């Protein structure tokens, strides 16, 4: 039996398309903060890279952000900074 060693680097073929989904309470600072975090590690975001949706009751806002990921280190850094942000409830 052959064992295949899969690492996070082999699961992705960098650079690659990658979607980040972020959910947080709807407030004025949420969008600015999310964009600022993602743009630390990527080029400036263009409006066509972002999809925004309000929750059914309007209390939450979700963002789907499309980026071209260059490495696993980049993805881990974005994910960690978003998780550390007090305005963000979930990161997928």
Curated annotation (Swiss-Prot):
InterPro entries: UPF0250_YbeD-like, YbeD-like_sf. It comes from the Bacteria. Gene3D superfamilies: 3.30.70.260. GO terms for cellular component: cytosol. It holds the Pfam family DUF493. Belongs to the UPF0250 family. PANTHER family: UPF0250 PROTEIN YBED (PTHR38036:SF1). This is UPF0250 protein Rmag_0541.
């Amino acid at each position: 039996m052959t064992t295949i060693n899969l690492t996070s680097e082999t699961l992705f073929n960098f650079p690659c398309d990658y979607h980040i989904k972020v959910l947080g309470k709807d407030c004025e600072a949420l969008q600015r903060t999310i964009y600022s975090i993602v743009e630390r590690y990527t080029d400036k975001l263009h409006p066509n890279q972002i999809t925004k949706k309000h929750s059914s009751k309007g209390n939450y806002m979700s963002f789907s952000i499309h980026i071209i990921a260059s490495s696993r280190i980049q993805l881990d850094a974005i994910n960690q900074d978003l998780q550390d942000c007090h305005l963000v409830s979930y990161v997928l």
